Amino acid sequence: MKILTVDIGTGTQDIFLYDSNLDIENGFKLVLPSPTMMVYRRLKQAFPSRTPVLLYGHQMGGGPSAWAIEEYARAGIPVYMTPDAARTINDELEKVEALGITIVGEDEVESLKSKVERLELKDFDFPLVAKTFADYGVSLKDLAAVAVAVFDHGNAPPGVSDRQFRFDYLDERIRARNSLSTFAFLSSDIPPIMTRLQAVADSARDLPCPLVVMDTAPAAVLGAMFDSKLSVYHSNNLHDTHPSSLPTRKAMIVCNVGNFHTLAFRLGEKGIEGVFEHHTGEIDLPKLEGLIRKLADASLKHEDVFDDMGHGALMYTDEVFEFGKDEFDVVVTGPRRSMFALTPTPSPYGRGGSLRPYFAAPFGDMMIAGCFGLLAATAEILPDLAEPVFGSLRSGRGRGVAPWDA
């Protein structure tokens, strides 16, 4: 039984093909440029020719792609975008047009074909992934499921901050079901306000199997907890993904330092006790440690992050999480995790001392942590897949079979 998992970030897209016949460590994996970086590089390469560009397809992750598109417009190079593609820049299309970008209907795409360089926008390109695996002799024609993670701010109403809108959504989901997997959905159950998740589903309508989509933030945290030292899933109930199944640590703080966003979840016996999200480019180690300490002592306020150009914070407890009881203070993952390896500097928060990180590497690979979170969430949403998936994910339960004997 195979499940394809794709964790799409700002810098990279991380791909893991789960095969129930193989130990997790022998599963095939890829770390490739993210879709937004692919668009960014293509536009940068084409920029000197000043050729008009038409961007069509779906809403996708912004950041680098949006920066490159806006650079074209500022340079006076004609830029045309279909409405769905334009939402990559902003959900309010009049703001896209204010940048000097021309919005065109889908029926106009063909007539512009000979006059522009065309570029299709989408986060998830299953045919390309399938071709890549096929070139190495691996077929994706027998998948039981596909799971894709993207970071979605949601479609905020005009005049509403997309950062605030996202945190209102996080709060709503956590209060509805306090579990990291509450942020995963079958493609048919995606909340209407989560337009980037829906765009992933729209671009994958021809899949021959169920599609699960999830937010990247909880996927990374959920996956990190499969590190054998954390022992999260050593439970008699294979389907139990609730933090109360923790036998060795009843609470922990997990921080994911991504290329574009940094977040931390405080997890306890009853689930998520607090969370904050910031932009990685706006923080350094002292600031990050200060926020984590506030998350731990339950003094963290939404404004502490939001007013500093971050997304925000949520607290669901007033109990103090005490550091120093274990051999590490915070679990760290993410491609920019080296921030915690830098020489400590005095904290501006006046609390003294540096936090002791544990660099989680589930099944020996930190970069695939989000894929393992996707895998676990998929098994929860599709119960028929749960037993083999959780049987594989439980640390120390490998079959010890060589790939040629599987």
Locate each region found by the language model.
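Redox- and metal-dependent alpha/beta enzyme cores, enriched for Fe-S-associated oxidoreductases
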Residues: 260-261, 281-289
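C-terminal catalytic subdomain
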Residues: 272-277
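A charged amphipathic helix-loop-strand protein-protein interaction module that recurs
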Residues: 290-300
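Short acidic-glycine loop/turn motifs at beta-strand connectors
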Residues: 19-21, 267-271
